[in-house]
Structures are given as structure tokens and as C-alpha cells.
Design a protein with these regions (language model features):
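Hydrophobic membrane-insertion alpha-helices, especially the h-region
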Residues: 7-19
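Glycine-rich short-loop/terminal segments
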Residues: 58-59, 63-137
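Positively charged n-region of N-terminal signal peptides that target proteins for export
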Residues: 1-4
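N-terminal, intrinsically disordered, polar/charged segments of Gram-positive cell-envelope systems
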Residues: 24-79, 83-86
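Domain-level detector of nuclease and nuclease-like folds
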Residues: 101-305
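Alpha-helical structural elements
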Residues: 14, 28, 48, 57, ...
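Short amphipathic alpha-helical "recognition" segments used for binding
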Residues: 6-7, 106
Length: 305
């Protein structure tokens, strides 16, 4: 018995020595193999998940909440007090313990949106290193690089009555056109329908709030009437001289417990410069695709047409 205890003590001491002397990258790699605590859905998020999707009622994959209006709550006000209300900022939370993209808050200004407009900056492609939760059948979370790795993709091209193309997109939480990054922390696995709805000109799915906000800034400065050369000859400050709009933007991918793919995204937007007169939005965007049953636990799916 004493020999067993001595052996256990030696193993423990060696393990402790290795842990204390390991570098951060090794620790992250080791921690990725440890069992994670379970995550439970909050009551408020469950209410959103429980909203039934009906393509006839929600042809563009979103439903308005509270008549489409929001109010700044205590956490919103605290964040604005802390981060400021004049200069643009973005708050990313990184990946959670399960490797999933989390909510993003931002103060959107004309300067931020102008800099990433297509007339000024061409949107880059996603790096091959950007992998998202649910993307792979054999997915593994790389805690060192904060991304997902895998060989067998869950994504495939489908031919459905309302869609011909790949089922999934790497879906921005904060759109590139609104100042978002192309990194894993700003991306979830979203259906094409979640991204653009029915491809309506006014924007569907996540495109609806994104288009509404983007057009507000573009219209204020006449960006749509500028040539690329004209836009690129101006600094953001010069281009946005006549714009006073400041939009508080809060986007929250919502998951059911430990699932890797969000059931949908809660989007809130509020123009703080005029108490929500210009922009006031509150909606739930369904992460669904008609004729497809998605296994949100791992991103696999079956076609049911």
C-alpha cells in the first residue's frame, strides 16, 4: 500500500512540475482535452429558441420582438458609460469553454462603416485557419489558435425547392460591412437562409438589420453616389463630416445548452444620438433552412423534402 501511495505521490509531483513549468500554449492544448462543465440555456434564451419557425410567417427567417423595438438596459448603459459614445469600438468575448462564438457589442459610427465599405476596402476571404464550432464531423477545438480543426466538413451543396447551394456559411456575428473582423471569435455556423433570408432586396435574415444600418450611414453621406475613386480619395473623417448617427449594436448567438451550432441570433440596435429615433431594432433570426433538419449538437443534418 505504501508503495502505491509513493508511486501516486511521485506521479502527482511530476505532473505538478510539468504544469507549473509548461508554457501557455502547452497548457491550452492540455486543457482542451479536459472535460468541460455543462452549459445550461438561460430562461430568456429558451424563450427565443421556443419561437416556432414557419416559412410562411417568417419568409426572411426573422421575427420582430417587442414590436421590433428595444430599450437600453442597465448592462447596455454601463457598457456605453465605460467604452464611450463618440468613437467607434467593438467588444468581442472570444470563444466560450466549448469553443463557440459569443455575443458581440459595438458602437457603430459612420467612420467605421465607411472604412469597410466595398468602395473603400475589398472584403478579404476567410483564412483557411478560421474554423467554427459545428463545421466538421470530426471537429476538434484548437485552444492554442482558438479555432476548430477537422478533415470532414458538415457543409455540402444542396438542391432544394428554395435553395441551390451550400447549406452553411461562416456567419458573421458583427458583419464585416459594419466593422466586424474575419476571425473565429466573430463567426458561427449559420445556414444560408439565416444569412440572407429569401434574398429580398431589403435584406433578410442577418442581412435585414445589417442592410438597414448600413444604408442609414451610406445615405447620410451619399456613398452610393460616389465612385470608388472618389470614396478612396477621402479620409473617413472627411466622408462622414455630415453624419451624427451612433448606433449601439448587440448581437447574441443563442445556443441550446451544450450544442455547438446556435439555434438563432438575437439582434438589437439603437441609435444613441437621438434616443432610437433613427435606428431601433429588436429581432430574432432563425438559424434554419426549409427542408433540412439540423442536428445543432454537432452540425450534421438530413434533408427532408
Amino acid at each position: 500500500m505504501k508503495k502505491i501511495l509513493s508511486f501516486i505521490s511521485i506521479v502527482f509531483m511530476v505532473g505538478l512540475f510539468l504544469y507549473v513549468n509548461a508554457d501557455d500554449e502547452l497548457l491550452k492544448e492540455l486543457e482542451s482535452y479536459l472535460p468541460q462543465e455543462s452549459v445550461e440555456t438561460t430562461e430568456g434564451d429558451q424563450e427565443l429558441i421556443d419561437i416556432e419557425y414557419d416559412i410562411n410567417k417568417h419568409p426572411d427567417n426573422y421575427v420582430l420582438l417587442n414590436d421590433g423595438k428595444m430599450k437600453l438596459d442597465k448592462s447596455d448603459k454601463h457598457r456605453l458609460d465605460k467604452r464611450g459614445t463618440e468613437t467607434a469600438w467593438v467588444n468581442y468575448k472570444g470563444l466560450d469553454q466549448l469553443g463557440r462564438g459569443q455575443d458581440v457589442q459595438a458602437l457603430l459610427t459612420c467612420e467605421l462603416v465607411f472604412k469597410q465599405s466595398s468602395k473603400v476596402t475589398e472584403r478579404p476571404d476567410f483564412s483557411s485557419s478560421v474554423g467554427v464550432a459545428g463545421q466538421y464531423k470530426d471537429g476538434r477545438l484548437d485552444r492554442v489558435k482558438e479555432t476548430w480543426r477537422g478533415e470532414e466538413s458538415n457543409n455540402t451543396e444542396l438542391h432544394l425547392p428554395n435553395h441551390n447551394g451550400y447549406l452553411y456559411n461562416k456567419s458573421h456575428t458583427l458583419a464585416w460591412s459594419l466593422g466586424g473582423s474575419m476571425e473565429t471569435e466573430n463567426v458561427t455556423l449559420g445556414t444560408r437562409r439565416q444569412n440572407v433570408g429569401s434574398n429580398d432586396a431589403d435584406g433578410g435574415g442577418m442581412g435585414y438589420p445589417e442592410t438597414t444600418i448600413r444604408n442609414q450611414f451610406y445615405n447620410e453621406i451619399g456613398l452610393n453616389d460616389m465612385t470608388k475613386a472618389e470614396a478612396q480619395s477621402m479620409t473617413p473623417e472627411q466622408a462622414c463630416e455630415k453624419s451624427n448617427t451612433k448606433v449601439y449594436y448587440d448581437v447574441d448567438p443563442v445556443y441550446q445548452d451544450d450544442e455547438l451550432v446556435p439555434r438563432g441570433t438575437h439582434v438589437r440596435a439603437y441609435s444613441i444620438n437621438d434616443d432610437g429615433e433613427t435606428i431601433n431594432m429588436n429581432l430574432w433570426v432563425f438559424n434554419t433552412q426549409p427542408y433540412v433538419d439540423i442536428n445543432y449538437a454537432d452540425g450534421t443534418f438530413t434533408v427532408n423534402q
